[in-house]
Amino acid sequence: MLAGAAWRMGGFAFEEFAADKKTGKKRRPTFRGRVDLYLKVGRQQYIAEAKYCWSGATSVRPATTQNLTNRLQEAVEDIRIVPRNGQRKLGILFATPYIAKSRKARVDELLNTWIAAMTSVKCSCSAWVFPAESRYISGLAICPGAAVLIKEI
């Protein structure tokens, strides 16, 4: 999704590439690892680690926000150990809310409650898309769209 956005803006993206990461130990200060994403748009360069999570939206509680925060923080911690070579560092979380099929009549209400919980997560920016057409497509659950939360460090 982000790679495609970079390309559409005349930039480029490189996914899943090898890089040295810091261990924090003197004996072996680095190890060879993988970075999820490199983006260049205009003069700006970014490296990012991304995580994905399913997030229950049938019953939103304080734990919902905390779980999203924790998963975003995992991405932040992962990018923190990658040396900065002139790039800005991003922790990214892609989250998909799901709603029990039995709550189909309340999808809009439950989705709005989930969005309120998601937007209370401290991050640099967030975006979401929940097209009306997809709000009622269901398998085991209703998965009406997705959100992305980005935290720059």
Predicted regions, residues:
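Conserved helicase motor "Helicase C" RecA-like lobe of SF1/SF2 P-loop NTPases
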Residues: 1-4
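A short acidic/basic microdomain associated with nuclease active sites
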Residues: 6-30, 36-37
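Secondary-structure boundary elements
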Residues: 8-12, 42, 84-85
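Short loop/turn segments at strand-loop or loop-helix junctions that form parts
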Residues: 18, 49-53, 95-98
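Short, solvent-exposed coil/turn elements at secondary-structure transition points
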Residues: 19, 53, 131-135
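Conserved catalytic cores of phosphodiester-cleaving nucleases, focusing on short active-site segments
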Residues: 35-58
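Mg2+/Mn2+-dependent nuclease catalytic core
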Residues: 54-84
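Glycine-rich, aromatic-bearing surface loops/beta-hairpins
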Residues: 86-153
